[in-house]
Amino acid sequence: SKVADDLKGLAKERFDVVIDFPGTAYNTYIAFRDTASHIIACGSLWMFGYPHIVPTPEIRQEKCVFEGYEKRYQEILEMIEDSGKHRAVFTAIMPPNICGPGKIPLETRGGRSIDVHHALKEGKPVYLPEGPEVLIGPCDASDIANLFALAVNNRIAAAGQIFNAGSAYSVTASQFVKIYSDIYGVDIPIEKVSWEVYKKDICPNIGQWWHFYAHMQPDISKARRLLGYSPRYTPEETIARAVDWMFAEKLL
């Protein structure tokens, strides 16, 4: 393919470190593994599947329900197995929900809709599913970027490893709503509905309701131990930074 040919052409430049963000890591790895020294891919916490362990370590929980993520996860496992058998070693970094300046933050319907943020700012009701509450853990983009930098600068420790990125803790769905209530300075009522109603009428897209179904609390102890990772921003702080950015960009 043209993409593969373009990557092979780039590989001739003999870059020391190659980082893949667009989700094309397997093609990147094949193209660069004989010329680069270190290849790092960005995955997702969701690739581990529905979490049965919280905080969730860097191991398979169950098959990922998102086909694209499942395919990429299998490729990551292949690259981990192949790491060091050619010139390059391989590392994968798995962030949770990415937050902070530069991107509309996750909102209470599991998306990044500016219209939902306007509704939150106006104190409109939020609908959450009944039952035990999910843990939501947005992580600041700068903290995720820092883990990539730590992997680059600690190649031996990072070689052949999968690392979770994440905040120091997560918050419940109700607390997630309260964070926005505090930031916008309004009371945001919460109304609970059945899961049937929630998935049918509130968040019909699995990519949205999964945020309120599967815990998002990565275990970051491995990154702390091997790379010295220490996230700077809490969920409250990174959401506030993202909202400040929206105001600065006149999105709100």
List each language-model region with its residue ranges.
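Substrate-positioning beta->alpha
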Residues: 107-116, 128-153, 160-161
